[in-house]
Design a protein with these regions (language model features):
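Bacterial N-terminal signal peptides
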Residues: 2-10
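Thioredoxin-like thiol-disulfide oxidoreductase module
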Residues: 28, 57-60, 64-108, 124-132, ...
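Local sequence-structure signature of Cys/Sec-based thiol-disulfide redox active-site neighborhoods
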Residues: 30-62, 136-169
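Non-catalytic, surface beta->alpha helical segment in thiol-disulfide oxidoreductase systems
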Residues: 100-130, 209-241
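Short, well-ordered secondary-structure micro-motifs
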Residues: 156-157, 189-190, 218
């Protein structure tokens, strides 16, 4: 499926597979080990003999700066021992070198073709809730992101509306929800990409469709009917429903 990857400066499209880390090859084994350790993987894909020294150095510096929260993995795309991973991530059709930032849950949080900077990789390390949102989208599902301060007056009503939306036969099995506390420091970078004010006293719910299009934005109260209306509008081609926008720093809303 086509997924929109969040980068520090732009949106990069890459073909990714939700089960890529389950492929039986040596890179998949490394990804599994790193993910189970709760770390990010910075994966450098390249062709043997290509000049990748500067990219390799950037990845090395990013790993050092992550202070135990990330590991580097290097993959020669011609290596048959990593063939499944290369195929599943669509790297055989991508410009090389390519660096992917992969969260512990397997979500690709950013992709950098050609070159990357250590800070860009650091920015790609979104928190667990942000990674969960991205994984849901990369699995081809709709995600409802509920940004709720502790003690939000609308939390109960919002939870009921979202539960009804997810249970509706029109979308059952194809929607997930993630609740994010705006005070959670680990999620500040992701909230910034969503353009949600973490200091707001009110709750904000975002309806996001693959690859990362925000098709509905709801402040405090939200209804199942409103969400389905915005979803239908986006499927009909009017992606400006509910405010439009995207879940990346370069998205400027409806274009």
């Amino acid at each position: 499926m086509m997924a929109v990857l969040l980068t520090s400066g732009c949106l990069v499209s890459s073909m990714i597979a939700a089960d890529a880390t389950n492929a039986v090859d040596k890179t998949a084994t490394q990804l599994k080990r790193v993910g189970e350790g709760g770390k990010y993987a910075f994966v450098l894909f390249h062709r043997k003999g290509a000049e990748v020294a500067s990219v390799r150095e950037s990845v090395k510096k990013a790993v050092e700066d992550a202070k135990g929260r990330a590991e580097a993995i290097e993959v020669d795309v011609a290596d048959t021992g990593s063939e499944a991973t290369v195929r599943n991530f669509g790297v055989n059709r991508a410009p090389l070198p390519l660096v992917l930032a992969i969260a512990p849950n397997g979500a690709v949080t950013a992709g950098f073709p050609g070159k990357c900077e250590p800070q860009a990789l650091a920015d790609a390390m979104v928190g667990p809730k942000g990674a969960s949102c991205l994984k849901t989208l990369q699995d081809g599902k709709v995600v409802l992101i509920c940004v709720e301060p502790t003690g939000s007056a609308s939390a109960e009503a919002t939870a009921k509306a979202i539960a009804a939306f997810k249970a509706d036969e029109r979308i059952s099995g194809f929607a997930e929800s993630v609740v994010i506390d705006p005070a959670d420091q680990a999620e500040q970078g992701f909230l910034g990409k969503l353009r949600v004010d973490p200091k707001s006293d009110g709750a904000t719910t975002l309806l996001v469709t693959p690859p990362g299009r925000i098709v509905g934005t709801y402040t405090n109260a939200v209804t199942t009917e409103a969400m389905f209306a915005d979803l239908a509008r986006s499927m009909a081609g009017s992606t400006c429903g509910g405010g439009g926008g995207g879940c990346g720093p370069a998205s400027g809303g409806c274009r």
